[in-house]
A protein has these predicted regions:
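Short amphipathic alpha-helical interaction segments
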Residues: 293, 437-453, 466
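Conserved N-terminal catalytic/coupling substructures associated with nucleotide/phosphate chemistry
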Residues: 1-297, 302-407, 426-427, 456-459, ...
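Short acidic, hydrophobic short linear motifs in intrinsically disordered regions
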Residues: 424-436
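N-terminal positioning helix adjacent to the helix-turn-helix/winged-helix DNA-binding module
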Residues: 354, 410-414, 443, 447
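Short alpha-helical segments that sit at the start of domains
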Residues: 405-421, 463-467
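A carboxyl-terminal module marker
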Residues: 416-419, 435, 445
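Charged, terminal alpha-helix-loop-beta segments
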Residues: 430-433, 445, 458-459
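Short, cationic-aromatic polyanion-contact patches
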Residues: 460-475
Length: 475
């Protein structure tokens, strides 16, 4: 970090009066903080790393108080970095600011194959942390497992289901699947039935796998009760909204069966609960019926959830959720993004496959391409319908796809209220919470950016408009 960059960062912290996802502040006026392990771990475990700024006192409105001893501070911070597994190599920068010495320590991100980074004295389970906003929170067992399974190439769709037997699978469906595989892969014809079952992950050590139970099971939920879909229609924009008659859900359904059956039934539920309007096609002048949301986008979102959700023991008690609100459709898939994939890479980079057996089977059983076209299809379909861009959220324990309809539009009153709200600088997250909208990316595009373009909102870091520490204010 350059001296001028640290100087700007200090100004930003004082102006915004806040820490952030990548910024931590410690006074260090009376000595080196004794417990930096939580922050060292959480910063190392996120893709952007983080910066610890020493010499600002949060209890005094981030007043510059200076550090007690620059050399000793760097030495003791390094000692704490060396007690992490793997060890951390912090990069220090020192400047004088308003007559006192300020020191920053840049904590680099470690490669995903080395995560989680944890404090050796506490062990992996108790010493691993994740950054959430401006807080360092202990990693859940699932989050630790997610890293470990990726490193060890563990695929939960291939794990055997102890109570399952071949008699509980649909023999005709398996035979048809194998026949298709033989036609496409001639070498399979030379293998024994047992070899084919093992190579196609239908069985593992002669026991049916999770993938085969979900695709060929007579009744998969008899063995895996919560690997299903729950679908609801809410008469409002938030869970808990009710009709004038006190009805909480206009429609609800638990959807079970094989993946193919659940996909078909889920789409049928969606079709039953979305509005249809008649429009005039501008290209041919003919009247056409158009659904509230593009069916192809809904299908791809549900299909992605079925194939790419987490199927580990940590999430097998959680079903996929489809939630209709008056202004949007949400599809919740258990488990966060897998491997190196990030929100920004969706639809652009080739993903690491969490469930390769399911992905292979889906090419034949669900008529999917397995060419990573799902996300681009969702985006394209929403654009063709002149609807807002789909919103993708990667949370600690779930992945959420949100499709907005035409009811979700900004209006003048909201703009005026938002401008008033930003009399003091506000982050994207704070603005999203104020508007009661879950997705910051949607808020940025539909609310914040139009007001910035109109000169009604200004940036606290104008030279870095996409900074994660950006805040917005009005005159």
């Amino acid at each position: 970090m350059l001296n001028i960059e640290l100087n700007d960062l200090i100004k930003q912290i004082i102006t915004t009066q806040a820490k952030s996802q990548t910024i931590e502040v410690k006074a260090a006026h009376g000595g080196t903080p004794k417990r930096l392990y939580d922050t060292l771990s959480s910063f190392s475990n996120q893709d952007d790393g983080g910066i610890i700024v020493f010499g600002l006192d949060e209890t005094q409105n981030f007043k510059p108080v200076g550090v007690y001893d620059l050399q000793d501070l760097q030495k003791k911070v390094t000692e704490q970095c060396n007690q992490m597994i793997p060890q951390i190599r912090a990069i220090f920068t020192i400047i004088e600011y308003e007559g006192v010495n300020i020191c920053s320590a840049e904590i680099p991100s470690i490669d995903i194959t080395n995560r989680p980074c944890y404090y050796a004295g506490a062990g992996k389970v108790k010493g691993s942390y994740v950054r959430v906003g401006d807080a360092d929170l202990p990693m859940t067992d699932y989050e630790i497992y997610n890293f470990e399974s990726f490193k060890s190439h563990v695929h939960d769709d291939e794990r055997p289901i102890d109570r399952a037997t071949l008699s509980l699978l649909r023999e005709n469906d398996i035979n048809n699947f194998i026949l298709q595989m033989k036609l496409n892969r001639p070498g399979f014809s030379k293998l024994s039935e047992n070899q084919i079952y093992e190579l196609l992950s239908i069985t593992r050590n002669n026991i049916p796998t999770l993938a085969s139970v979900l695709n060929f099971g007579i009744y998969p939920q008899g063995l895996l009760p919560q690997l299903a879909i729950t679908a609801i229609v809410v008469p409002g924009e938030t869970i808990g909204d009710i009709t004038s008659d006190g009805i909480r859900f206009l429609d609800k359904k638990r959807i079970e069966g094989t993946l193919s059956e659940m996909l078909d039934e889920a789409i049928a539920f969606c079709k039953r609960n979305i509005k249809v309007q008649t429009i005039i096609n501008p290209n041919n002048g003919k009247r056409e019926d158009r659904t509230e949301y593009p069916i192809n986008a809904i299908r791809e979102a549900i299909l992605n959830a079925l194939i790419h959700r987490d199927y580990s023991i940590y999430t097998e008690g959680t079903p996929i959720q489809i939630c209709f609100f008056t202004n949007r459709l949400e599809i919740h898939s258990p488990g966060s993004l897998y491997g190196r994939m990030t929100i920004f890479d969706l639809g652009k980079a080739r993903p690491d496959l969490r469930n390769p057996a399911l992905a292979t089977m889906s090419e034949f059983l669900l008529k999917t391409e397995n060419r990573y076209s799902g996300i681009p299809t969702i985006r394209r379909e929403m654009k063709e319908y002149n609807l807002p861009e789909p919103v993708f959220e990667n949370k600690r324990n779930e992945f959420v796809v949100t499709l907005y309809n035409n009811q979700h539009t900004s209006n003048n009153n909201e703009d005026i209220d938002l401008i008033r709200f930003c009399k003091s600088p506000k982050s994207r997250k704070e603005i999203a919470e104020y508007l009661d909208i879950k997705t910051t990316s949607f808020v940025t595009k539909e609310y914040i950016q139009p007001l910035v373009d109109a000169g009604k909102l200004k940036l606290t870091i104008p030279d870095k408009p996409k900074s994660k520490n950006q805040k917005y204010y009005s005159d």
